[in-house]
Curated annotation (Swiss-Prot):
UniProt PTM: Genome polyprotein: Specific enzymatic cleavages in vivo yield mature proteins. Cleavages in the lumen of endoplasmic reticulum are performed by host signal peptidase, whereas cleavages in the cytoplasmic side are performed by serine protease NS3. Signal cleavage at the 2K-4B site requires a prior NS3 protease-mediated cleavage at the 4A-2K site.
Protein name listed in UniProt: Structural polyprotein
Site (Cleavage): R105, G106, A127, M128, R219, S220, S294, F295, A794, D795
Keywords in alphabetical order: Capsid protein, Clathrin-mediated endocytosis of virus by host, Cleavage on pair of basic residues, Disulfide bond, Fusion of virus membrane with host endosomal membrane, Fusion of virus membrane with host membrane, Glycoprotein, Host endoplasmic reticulum, Host membrane, Host-virus interaction, Membrane, Secreted, Transmembrane, Transmembrane helix, Viral attachment to host cell, Viral envelope protein, Viral penetration into host cytoplasm, Virion, Virus endocytosis by host, Virus entry into host cell
Length: 1198
């Protein structure tokens, strides 16, 4: 009886518990067993046997099988594997016995075995070679030898060796040598891939393969990023992506700091666009272009025009790479002066870096524990790099004792690719300059240099530091002389030319020397720091592999992002450089001034062509034969009105030959808009309509931008900021000098009230105009005028008007007026008070107790932000207050510097509002700004000269100047507010503190100097006139208080005024008599000493003064407290106790005046004791028993 499923199994019709095995085909059963074993199921012995089978056949076991192998307990696995080992030993013995029985048989089989053995020996002889290494047998193998046992016959019998290395390739330079230890019977190999059974031998093989490169390390060398080059040049930097980001940040800052201009640009962009998309694009473009007028504009135009004044005899030119200057002066032919090439040759090799190395001939010597230290004989070879270490040794790798054994590995280093650094020497820089006359040039000769030289219309010359002057003969045009002063714009001591592969770069010297790569010097062949491009891998018992790093060329190229790319073969063409030349035109003359006018007809050989520089080139054909004759050509606004407009670039054009149909090229500059080029006279007159796009207003702005660009590019190199001299009022000069010149060029002669009224008039006309485009033009122009008239606008860069004694940084005027009072409209501000507060906190933690201001404007900045800084410090739980004290005397220097930080303090709106109304309480710790030196905060613990000008901004009442923390540690004054110029017989060094004026009267000499305050920075050499070969002892204003190292800072009869009254206020240095006094020159006068006031403590006037060899009128200092004389001028026989002396010593350290006995010397009469005379001054500084005069002060005398 059957039941439904679910009941007990025994009662079912089919009993599942007693069901028999199914009938299965035998092969299917075997397959199932094998598959279960492959899946890791089954008896352990079967699993281990299957794994052993896979090992012997070099097949990869399945993942499941390996998983089961890892899961087997150690004791169980060891038991089965030991039994396998016994079975294998039994099989080996059986084979050995079988071999002996067969040897006894003799006959034909013996002959076959002998031949087989001979073949094996011949094959081994062809593949394996035997030699000696460090007193032991060395076998050299290839990749075919590792498949079988290597048998080496020895005196002790056959030595069988097994090599299981996986890096065996074919023989090449990349070889490795190491020891195969002897393993006793029953010991398994451990941490070795080569072993023998009779005696140890060395194995050597090559590691090269035919399918892939040799093994190399995955590690790379860390190369510090080069960063953006500080050089101003016309070539793009390598992989430079920083400028775009930096410019976007600059645009953002400009919008925030100049909201009025940003609003105006947005309004103009909105009016210019006809739809929303265009308006957005125009607005973005205007906002991106606008900051270019304010700071750090680079990239010069190819051509600049300089129009000279009548009677000019010379002009100073500043030529840049690939630039051209067109010089026009009355009654002189027009000249083109072109910088053709700047080239440096004979570069001296400094150092070579290896960026791709190869490692060959690796050898390892190993020793067992207690057998001594391993020593590789290749250590004696300097081309090898060696490394010693220790490895685990024992029975499994040939040693009788377990422990640490010594190992010594050597590998040969060779450089595959290297980067070479070379230095440029100033005397090897050559400047190639061409001078071309705008004469009667035919179209065939135009651009043909050889033909123009043959016609004496061009000349080319080379300027070097050893040959800076040259006179050029220009035929009938006379001659020109050029006195040049090469200024490469490249500090050759700060840059190297580095060649990496096929590319060369101009790199910073410090970066080059800090590269972490193997290097060698030109005089040596040995590489230093070779281990940087090698990697010693983990040492095994007797073997250690050494690999080389891959090529570091890619890393070097990436690190060089921002460096300037140059072309180098045997010489290097420089793209950063300037040549300042004085072009003397006194012997230059116009040719053809006496020729008559051409009477026949002209025709245009070709249509007039635009040169791209605002000028037009006209090629004319003259049909007459009455040459040479002058060409009647003019540009007019209308054919009904023949009044000339525009100007001729080719002065006095003429036809040079009498042959008919001769062709002549003439260049002229037409006005903006519509005009007519008229050639000829009467009924033979021809004309051509010409339209020049643009406007006078736009031209003023574009030329201003070019001047700003040139000034920014010349910056640190050119002291004259452009072309000065006899053509001070030239167009090019005005462009070079002033950044905000467009507004002043057009409306500078009007008062701001007139400018505002004119703007209002234009706005009114725009509102009432019917034509939409005209209305928009009036509204835009009027809006610009009103806005500019009511704002003080400024840019980085300063211009000097010597006649008006005026210095302009943008339009923020810094005037020295007739009553000799300083009026400034500048306000210094920190980049952000939040970051400055964090910088102060960080400096205080580093032991800086305070700050010394460099100038009065910096002191005023600290005063203005003091309360805000203190609120920020308090809000961020910093127990520190900034205290600003009144400065005493001159602004002194200090040794420390504030350091930059990216962190900022935060402040809420509530605290900010409270800071406007209430000053915060004084904290327990203070950060002192200026004031007298105290024990709590001596000058040794103060910071100084930590800030520099970042940008100029705009304001209603003052020009705002933003300061940022300096990245470098320097004593130089900030060059952003320094202006230097020469005009005629006057030279000026000036900044926002000093006005130093020199005049030429037979010789150049200091005339006067006015000081807003006295500071302690040094005047930068890059902004110094005539600074070659100046001795500091001759500088009247000491260089330690920002006196320029210039020959303009000298006057005959006077030495450095290091003990002048520099701590006084309102100092004016000039050469005249103090009121009510007289000065006589006599040999009986006293020696130099500290400056003395002409009135005593009680106010009594000292009338009689003398000097030994000074020049008259005498040097005097006018201050708020009275009149002082220079150090050479002494009172005649007066009571010393009532004299008021200067207590200043402007020398560094504890130096005493080289021309006097120091502050303690006598001030009248003859000095006592041994003395010497220096330039007519009695000096007894040698009378103190110290060093000799020559030893002590020889470097001050000349």
């Amino acid at each position: 009886m059957t039941k439904k499923p679910g009941g007990p199994g025994k009662n079912r019709a089919i009993n599942m518990l007693k069901r028999g095995l199914p009938r299965v085909f035998p092969l299917v059963g075997v397959k199932r067993v094998v598959m279960s074993l492959l899946d890791g199921r089954g008896p352990v012995r079967f699993v281990l046997a299957l794994i052993t089978f896979f090992k012997f056949t070099a097949l990869a076991p399945t993942k499941a099988l390996l998983g089961r192998w890892r899961a087997v307990e150690k004791s169980v696995a060891m038991k089965h594997l030991t039994s396998f080992k016994r079975e294998l030993g039994t099989l080996i013995d059986a084979v050995n016995k079988r071999g002996k029985k067969q040897n006894k048989r003799g006959g034909n089989e013996s002959s076959i075995m002998w031949l087989a053995s001979l073949a094996i020996v011949i094959a081994c002889a062809g593949a394996m070679k035997l030699s000696n290494f460090q007193g032991k047998l060395l076998m050299t193998i290839n990749n075919t030898d590792i498949a079988d046992v290597i048998v080496i016959p020895t005196s002790k019998g056959e030595n069988r060796c097994w090599v299981r290395a996986i890096d065996v390739g074919y023989m090449c330079e990349d070889t490795i040598t190491y020891e195969c230890p002897k393993l006793a019977v029953g010991n398994d190999p451990e941490d070795v891939d080569c072993w023998c059974d009779n005696q140890e031998v060395y194995v050597q093989y090559g590691r090269c393969t035919r399918t892939r490169h040799s093994k190399r390390s995955r590690r790379s060398v860390s190369v510090q990023t080069h960063g953006e080059s500080s050089l101003v040049n016309k070539k793009e930097a390598w992989l430079d992506s920083t400028k775009a980001t930096r410019y976007l940040m600059k645009t953002e800052n400009w919008i925030i700091r100049n909201p009025g201009y940003a609003f105006l640009a947005a309004a103009l962009g909105w009016m210019l666009g006809s739809n929303s998309g265009q308006r957005v694009v125009f607005t973005i473009l205007l906002l991106l272009v606008a900051p270019a007028y304010s700071f750090n504009c680079l990239g010069m135009g190819n051509r600049d025009f300089i129009e000279g004044a009548s009677g000019a005899t010379w002009v100073d030119l500043v030529l840049e790479g690939d630039s051209c200057l067109t010089i026009m002066a009355n009654d002189k032919p027009t000249l083109d002066v072109r910088m053709i090439n700047i080239e440096a040759s004979q570069l001296a090799e400094v150092r070579s870096y290896c960026y791709h190395a190869s490692v060959t001939d690796i050898s390892t010597v190993a020793r067992c524990p207690t057998t001594g230290e391993a020593h590789n004989e290749k250590r004696a070879d300097s081309s090898y790099v060696c490394k010693q270490g220790f490895t685990d040794r024992g029975w499994g790798n040939g040693c009788g004792l377990f422990g640490k054994g010594s190992i010594d590995t050597c590998a040969k280093f060779s450089c595959t690719s290297k980067a070479i650094g070379r230095t440029i020497q100033p005397e090897n820089i050559k400047y190639e300059v061409g001078v071309f006359v705008h004469g009667t040039t035919t179209s065939e000769n135009h651009g043909n240099y050889s033909a123009q030289v043959g016609a004496s219309q061009a000349a080319k010359f080379t300027v070097t530091p050893n040959a800076p002057s040259i006179t050029l003969k220009l035929g009938d045009y006379g001659e020109v002389t050029l006195d040049c002063e090469p200024r490469s714009g490249l500090n050759t001591e700060a840059f190297y030319v580095m060649t990496v592969g096929s590319k060369s770069f101009l790199v910073h010297r410090e970066w080059f020397h800090d590269l972490s790569l193997p290097w060698t010097s030109p005089s040596s062949t040995a590489w230093r720091n070779r281990e940087l491009l090698m990697e010693f891998e983990e040492a095994h018992a007797t073997k250690q592999s050494v690999v080389a790093l891959g090529s570091q060329e890619g890393g070097l190229h990436q690190a060089l992002a921002g460096a300037i790319v140059v072309e180098y073969s045997s010489s290097v063409k420089l793209t950063s450089g300037h040549l300042k030349c004085r072009l003397k035109m006194d012997k230059l003359a116009l040719k053809g001034t006496t020729y008559g006018m051409c009477t026949e007809k002209f025709s245009f050989a070709k249509n007039p062509a635009d040169t791209g520089h605002g000028t037009v080139v006209i090629e004319l054909t003259y049909s007459g034969s009455d040459g040479p004759c002058k060409i009647p050509i003019v540009s007019v606004a209308s054919l009904n009105d023949m009044t000339p407009v525009g100007r001729l670039v080719t002065v006095n054009p003429f036809v040079a030959t009498s042959s008919s149909n001769s062709k002549v090229l003439v260049e002229m500059e037409p006005p903006f808009g519509d005009s007519y080029i008229v050639v000829g006279r009467g009924d033979k007159q021809i004309n051509h309509h010409w339209y020049k796009a643009g406007s006078t207003l736009g031209k003023a702005f574009s030329t201003t931008l070019k001047g700003a660009q040139r000034l920014a590019a010349l910056g640190d190199t050119a002291w004259d900021f452009g072309s000065i001299g006899g053509v001070f009022n030239s167009i090019g000069k005005a462009v070079h000098q002033v950044f905000g010149g467009a507004f002043r060029t057009l409306f500078g002669g009007m008062s701001w009230i007139t400018q505002g009224l004119m703007g209002a008039l234009l706005l009114w006309m725009g509102v009432n105009a019917r034509d939409r485009s005209i209305a928009l033009a009036f509204l835009a122009t009027g809006g610009v005028l009103v806005f500019l008239a009511t704002n003080v606008h400024a840019d980085t860069g300063c211009a000097i008007d010597i006649t008006r004694k005026e210095m302009r940084c943008g339009s923020g005027i810094f005037v020295h007026n007739d009553v000799e009072a300083w009026v400034d409209r500048y306000k210094y501000l920190p980049e952000t008070p939040r970051s400055l507060a964090k910088i102060v906190h960080k400096a205080h933690q580093e032991g800086v107790c305070g700050v010394r201001s460099v100038t009065r404007l910096e002191h005023q900045m600290w005063e203005s932000v003091r309360d805000e800084l203190n609120v920020l410090l308090k809000e961020n739980a910093v127990d520190l207050s900034v205290v600003v004290n009144k400065p005493v005397g001159r602004y002194r220097s200090a040794p420390k510097r504030l350091s930059m930080t990216q962190e900022k303090f935060e402040m809420g709106w509530k605290a900010w509002g409270k800071s406007i109304l209430f000053a915060p309480e004084l904290a327990n710790s203070t950060f002192v700004v200026d004031g007298p030196e105290t024990k709590e905060c001596p000058d040794e613990r103060r910071a100084w000269n930590s800030m520099q000008i970042e940008d100029f901004g705009f304001g209603i009442t003052s020009t705002r100047v933003w300061l940022k923390i300096r990245e470098e540690n320097t004593d130089e004054c900030d060059g952003a507010i320094i202006g230097t110029a020469v005009k005629g017989h006057v030279a000026v060094h000036s900044d926002l503190s000093y006005w130093i004026e020199s005049r030429l009267n037979d010789t150049w000499k200091l005339e006067r100097a006015v000081f807003g305050e006295v500071k302690s920075c040094t005047w930068p050499e890059t902004h110094t006139l005539w600074g070659d070969g100046v001795e500091e002892s001759e500088l009247i204003i000491p260089h330690t208080i920002a006196g320029p190292r210039s020959k303009h800072n000298r006057r005959e009869g006077y030495k450095t005024q290091n003990q002048g009254p520099w701590d006084e206020n309102g100092i004016v240095l000039d050469f005249d008599y103090c009121p009510g006094t007289k000065v006589t020159i006599t040999e009986d006068c006293g020696k130099r000493g500290p400056s003395i006031r002409t009135t005593t403590d009680s106010g009594k006037l000292i009338t009689d003064w003398c000097c030994r060899s000074c020049s008259l009128p005498p040097l005097r200092f006018r201050t708020e407290n009275g009149c002082w004389y220079g150090m050479e001028i002494r009172p005649v026989r007066h009571d010393e106790t009532t004299l008021v002396r200067s207590q200043v010593d402007a020398f560094n350290g504890e130096m005493i005046d080289p021309f006097s006995a120091g502050p303690s010397g006598d001030v009248s009469g003859h000095p006592g004791g041994p003395s010497q005379e220096v330039d007519g001054q009695i000096d007894d500084s040698c009378g103190f028993g110290g060093p000799t005069c020559a030893d002590a002060w020889g470097h001050h005398l000349h």
